[in-house]
Amino acid sequence: MPATNSDEPLVKFELYQLKKCYYIVSENATATIFRILKITQSEDELSISIEEAAKILFRQKLQLYLEKLENESADGKLILVTKAYAILGLFRFTAGYYLYLCTERKVVAVIGGHNVYHVDKTQFIELNPSRRHNTSVERKCMSSIEKVDLARTFYFSYSYDLSQTIQYGFTHPIPQHQVRDMFVWNWNMLRPILDSVGIDSPWCIPLIHGFVDQAKLSVYGKPIIVTLIARRSRHFAGARFLRRGIRDDGYVANEVETEQIVFDGSASSFPISSTTPGIPCYTSYVQHRGSIPLRWSQEFSNITPKPPIGIDFHDPFYASTALHFDRLFGHYGIPCIVLNLVKSSEKVKRESLLLDEFESAIQYLNQFLKDSQKIQYIAWDMSAASKKKVPVTKTLEQMASDIVKKTGFFCTADRFFPGTFQTGVVRTNCVDCLDRTNAAQFVIGKCVLAAQLRALGVLDSPQLDYESDAVRLLAEMYHGHGDAIALQYGGSLLVNTLDTYRKNNQWSSTSRDLIESVKRFYSNSFVDFQRQEAISLFLGNFTVHGKIVVFGEKRLQALTEKFKNGQLVRRDYRYWWTPVYVNQELRCKNAYCDSIQRKGIKFPANYFDNVYTPNSISSFSEVLLPNLISTLNFAPLSLIPLLRKSFLPLSYNGFGIEAPSLNPFIPRRNQPRDMFKTSAEEENEDEDEDDDKFRRVSLYKWLFNNEERPVHKFIRKRLHQIPVSNKVQPRDQKQPDFKIPNTDINVYKIHFQYNNISGLADNYTLLSKHDRAMYNNYADYSPDKIKEIKEKELNTYNDYFNSAISENPTLKSDRSEKVAFYSAWITDYKST
């Protein structure tokens, strides 16, 4: 499993057949280490034997090993069956075993130097097809499981555990790390391999079902990466009307955990621990959605689009509901905040029945808890509120702000920030946990995004406008997130989108909503039963009796067996929670201590092999991060040569700069319309000294004020020294001049003043050798964080430069050019 041991990930697989045996040859990312897995099926095909024939082989020994296998076999020859990128598992129905392989993949996200892949194509390999018992039941099962569309919304990673949150990864030492099988959809398929090679083996690759998306906020050239991960629970999974409410073991229908990760994309790797200062800083926030945890259902009919809701079982002790909330306490801690969005007033009671019963359940459970541990319940009829003049987003904003303050969010430490933990979770639901729930989760995500950006030093206050590029980008991500979850559970895309609740584009959103309503009704009427059968087969929730397949019986048998063995004990109805789960002080203490233990962990030399493959040629057009959906707006064309040689960041795609950089956090409606306006006088001006057909713009005018200042001769001289291949070629069309809004200028200053260590100059003589080295590295590699262009900064830089030379004379040649250019830069600024 990923991230559980020190074994190198296996990223490519070749399946060979030799008589009755199968050999899987795997290799690491650099194709330097190989491992071999042997699979043998019994004569009766009811059992299978798996062993690791060779653990570590180099290429030369691999060839010798394969030749030896062929020589030892009298009449056999190794036959290449297929190639794959992941082993998803082994399973059987009524006859022999099938091997499940991922044959095509695509990178969709990069987290901490770990690639996350989407499954594009899969293949079933029948072991021993010559003895195949092609019964009608076998054919039906195989046909059903192929209907589970693995070319959609299934994800895996070789080296990153997608089943766990980032906070868990940072606060649990790697030897104690455990995969959450609740979100591993191929868990039953991996069982034969797990039993043979162990859970820590890189042969076992967990598969999650849900949604993964990644985008980039360009903040004056600095990439801020936003990642959205949705994990769907495999327990009580299925179609909308066939999976409602809660199961007896506390798992609910349509249960999804959504994690919003925001980090500085300037560096790739994770910090060593959450409490150790590191670059970059990682932040995350987790939300939860799931069906109302009561025993309820809907009598589905092909005639009625909204079947009546009925409560199947009134438990006076709410035992299943108690198990559900105790599990939430165990995963996330306290407080557990319930945001219930079902309707409260209806002509014919449907959703309101669940509202009353849910309130009674929480009141009953809370009476046994301390005030600080109680479930915090918020009921709000979002459907009724959307019909009023006041936008529902305003009310949700207030709720979201209070929720985030109570739960906090996870953030790793840096030099000036100790780091924080998320303690507690918000559980959002409506009747389907689709449309209203997704809109509410977006508003909470928007509120958290502002807080995360503030922790990263991008914003000075946790406020974001809906019309800004950053929020629009986040809204698109949550829209895709909601569509994926709705398609998996309801059979259609979102019926009511965020635009519906914000009352934007009413005509287009209304027509779209009607179309999706029809699609959902059709899916629920004619397709859901087939989908439910396929999902049950895929998850292994069936039992074979001779040649008959019975669904659902396997789980009940396992539950009965646990009761018999004493592994499952009925809880006291008054003490329904686990005490250690609600001990917040102990949880935080343990998390901090476990995080400290990670400080001694050293990343292996092959840490980046999956992201930056050393034995293959790759281009920027093929790498994910430069091609992410982004708010990127570019600086003016005339600034490229200067920025490439200056200390300022550059957002450059290699094809030229298209437009001035705009602040992604300013509302678009407030942007000055004449920003790109070209005056008639400017059109008649002569070409500048560089023979470009556009007017040069001063760097200082762009950054600090709106008055044009001349570029220093030294800089112009340096521009002519740039190789022709690095210069931006002149264009036939003249580039317009522009004015930078003061808001952009102020935010730019704030952004690059954050975590500025140039203030250490006053106490340089008192600094330790370690801090001096840090400052020298800063001056050498990160001079883009200089607060202002002043003469004292040059003196400070020279002081550190001279001190560094005295400690390491070899640095003189490396720094002299930078100091000279820096001096010319300041001289030019003073002269203007």
Curated annotation (Swiss-Prot):
Q: List the subcellular locations.
A: Cytoplasm; Vacuole membrane
Name the needed cofactors: Mg(2+)
Q: Name one GO molecular function term.
A: phosphatidylinositol-3,5-bisphosphate 5-phosphatase activity
Catalysed reaction, written as an equation: a 1,2-diacyl-sn-glycero-3-phospho-(1D-myo-inositol-3,5-bisphosphate) + H2O = a 1,2-diacyl-sn-glycero-3-phospho-(1D-myo-inositol-3-phosphate) + phosphate
- The regions listed as transmembrane in this protein's record are none
**Membrane topology qualifier:** Peripheral membrane protein
List the GO cellular component terms: cytosol; fungal-type vacuole membrane; intracellular membrane-bounded organelle; PAS complex
Per UniProt, which keywords does this protein have?
Answer: Cytoplasm, Hydrolase, Membrane, Vacuole
Q: Where is the SAC domain?
A: 145-491
From its record, what is one biological process in GO terms?
signaling
What Enzyme Commission number does this protein have? 3.1.3.-
Please indicate if the UniProt record lists Ubl conjugation as a keyword. no
The free-text function statement in the UniProt record for this protein reads:
The PI(3,5)P2 regulatory complex regulates both the synthesis and turnover of phosphatidylinositol 3,5-bisphosphate (PtdIns(3,5)P2).
Which PANTHER family does this entry report, sorted A to Z?
Answer: POLYPHOSPHOINOSITIDE PHOSPHATASE (PTHR45738:SF5)
Subunit structure, interactors included: Component of the PI(3,5)P2 regulatory complex.
Q: What is this protein called?
A: Polyphosphoinositide phosphatase
The organism of origin for this protein: Schizosaccharomyces pombe (strain 972 / ATCC 24843) (Fission yeast)
